Amino acid sequence: MAGAKEIRSKIASVQNTQKITKAMEMVAASKMRKSQERMAASRPYAETMRKVIGHLALGNLEYKHPYLDERDVKRVGYLVVSTDRGLCGGLNINLFKRLLAEMKGWSEKGVETDLALIGSKAASFFGSVGGNVVAQVTGMGDNPSLSELIGPVKVMLQAYDEGRLDKLYIVSNKFINTMSQEPQIVQLLPLPPAEDGELKKKSWDYLYEPDPKVLLDTLLRRYVESQVYQGVVENLASEQAARMVAMKAATDNGGSLIKELQLVYNKARQASITQELTEIVSGASAV
């Protein structure tokens, strides 16, 4: 059994770690509230944009935009949204596992994949496991802006425009609630039609002013940008929630470990006192 002094040292070490994890839990909770507000503020715009685009995909358009056309799939692209920091449980690895399974399915069909990475964890992961990374951006912090995301988005849209990509997806974590975050892979291009059964029964016609080509070119790029930005802010809210839960679990585990060490310490101290008493009694008997 370890000595009492050594056990006291372990208890002090765990207590120090517990203070750190508790502080990180509180910081994550504060950041989560802010990121939830940012997510809630942008979600109506992203959802409305998705609905309008769904109508367009079902509409009788004067100008058929290339983003509406299905192609024979030879290469697909993924915009992968991850975190810049760790200590957020299995948030990133669960997302990467989902993506790898998807990529394996395409590979079995002879389809190649390109990756545009957002966040240092994705860059580190695919730097280790391999993958055709064509763009990446890291270090966006807790308040990402659309201007920081333009680089990877522009690279993937250009590849799609030039016919080098036949499908484009965004891979991110969807914020369900504080305890639940769900990895999701959402198709961006070609535009998926509206999923609502009632909408599919309707025929959507639009009048364009001044020119349908200019209007649709702008609208469809805004659509992609809005979905990517929404994916990033939802992933950020998921990150802070996952970190808060992970740090709370670490703090609770630290408390349990301290109780166990305290019990071991008491036993060690009791054994030491018993040993001393035995030695005193033995010495007195010898005299």
From Swiss-Prot:
Instruction: Respond yes or no to whether keyword Transferase is given for this record.
Output: no
Q: Which domain of life is it from?
A: Bacteria
GO MF term (any one): proton-transporting ATP synthase activity, rotational mechanism
The listed locations are: Cell inner membrane
- UniProt cross-references to InterPro entries, sorted A to Z: ATP_synth_F1_ATPase_gsu, ATP_synth_F1_gsu, ATP_synth_F1_gsu_CS
Mostly located where?
Answer: membrane
- What processes in GO biological process is this protein linked to? proton motive force-driven plasma membrane ATP synthesis
CDD domains the record matches: F1-ATPase_gamma
Q: How does it sit in the membrane?
A: Peripheral membrane protein
A Pfam family per the record:
ATP-synt
Q: Name one GO cellular component term.
A: plasma membrane
Q: Which UniProt keywords apply?
A: ATP synthesis, Cell inner membrane, Cell membrane, CF(1), Hydrogen ion transport, Ion transport, Membrane, Transport
Its quaternary organisation is:
F-type ATPases have 2 components, CF(1) - the catalytic core - and CF(0) - the membrane proton channel. CF(1) has five subunits: alpha(3), beta(3), gamma(1), delta(1), epsilon(1). CF(0) has three main subunits: a, b and c.
Q: What does this protein do?
A: Produces ATP from ADP in the presence of a proton gradient across the membrane. The gamma chain is believed to be important in regulating ATPase activity and the flow of protons through the CF(0) complex.
Q: Tell me the protein family, please.
A: Belongs to the ATPase gamma chain family.
From the Swiss-Prot or TrEMBL record, give the protein name.
ATP synthase gamma chain
Q: Which organism is it from?
A: Serratia proteamaculans (strain 568)
